[in-house]
Amino acid sequence: MIASVRGEVLEVALDHAVIEAAGVGYRVNATPSTLSTLRTGTQARLITAMIVREDSMTLYGFTDAETRDLFLTLLSVSGVGPRLAMATLAVHDAGALRQALHDGDVAALTRVPGIGKRGAERMVLELRDKIGAAGAAGAPAGAARNGHAVRGPVVEALVGLGFAAKQAEEATDKVLAAEPEAGTSGALRAALSLLGKSR
């Protein structure tokens, strides 16, 4: 899986950028706020999520791992694909989105093109317990930092291996709840084992 891309920015368009890394130009889809930080001809690094489908492999880029993880979490919601997840993050930054989900703010969520009242309510229902409010207290600091660092790459790897985003999220959350200090490789092995038993 491609977890990040670093290199020269060759092109910045309305919905994507092209970044050259080791002689290869990667097209990375991104939100306007992320694209606004890039300048053609300069060096840049984006945290990425690679979504693999039967007929495509698409990179989505973010300025930080928290936003990337939130993107992957949005994909676990029924009816939310990569385009709608990116549209959501284009309208709301990570902190505002967490707060809206925590507060059940349907009005804020329906400001996203493509999300109606029912879709917003489903988002709140499915994600409120998964996503805490911005700055909310939760697990001990060390465990929280570790879970944050491990969760995104594990979920991304599982999605890349063909598991549904929701399955990947649930399996990873179970593993990290049982083993908060697990490393990325250990958590991935445990999640694969868990998913293998459920098949």
UniProtKB/Swiss-Prot annotation:
CDD domains given in the database record: UBA_RuvA_C
Ranges where the record places region Flexible linker: 143-153
GO terms assigned for molecular function: ATP binding; four-way junction DNA binding; four-way junction helicase activity
Gene3D superfamilies: 5' to 3' exonuclease, C-terminal subdomain, DNA helicase RuvA subunit, C-terminal domain, Nucleic acid-binding proteins
KW DNA-binding (keyword) present: yes
Region feature (Domain II): 64-142
Pfam families assigned to the protein according to its UniProt record, in alphabetical order: HHH_5, RuvA_C, RuvA_N
Lineage: superkingdom: Bacteria
Region (Domain I): 1-63
UniProt KW Thylakoid keyword: no
Positions of region (Domain III): 153-199
Keywords in alphabetical order: Cytoplasm, DNA damage, DNA recombination, DNA repair, DNA-binding
Cellular localisation: Cytoplasm
GO CC, one annotated term: cytoplasm
Biological process (GO), any one: DNA recombination
NCBIfam families: ruvA (TIGR00084)
Entry text on domains: Has three domains with a flexible linker between the domains II and III and assumes an 'L' shape. Domain III is highly mobile and contacts RuvB.
Subunit structure: Homotetramer. Forms an RuvA(8)-RuvB(12)-Holliday junction (HJ) complex. HJ DNA is sandwiched between 2 RuvA tetramers; dsDNA enters through RuvA and exits via RuvB. An RuvB hexamer assembles on each DNA strand where it exits the tetramer. Each RuvB hexamer is contacted by two RuvA subunits (via domain III) on 2 adjacent RuvB subunits; this complex drives branch migration. In the full resolvosome a probable DNA-RuvA(4)-RuvB(12)-RuvC(2) complex forms which resolves the HJ.
Function: The RuvA-RuvB-RuvC complex processes Holliday junction (HJ) DNA during genetic recombination and DNA repair, while the RuvA-RuvB complex plays an important role in the rescue of blocked DNA replication forks via replication fork reversal (RFR). RuvA specifically binds to HJ cruciform DNA, conferring on it an open structure. The RuvB hexamer acts as an ATP-dependent pump, pulling dsDNA into and through the RuvAB complex. HJ branch migration allows RuvC to scan DNA until it finds its consensus sequence, where it cleaves and resolves the cruciform DNA.
Family (UniProt): Belongs to the RuvA family.
Protein name listed in UniProt: Holliday junction branch migration complex subunit RuvA
Native organism taxonomy: Bacteria, Bacillati, Actinomycetota, Actinomycetes, Mycobacteriales
Gene that encodes the chain: ruvA
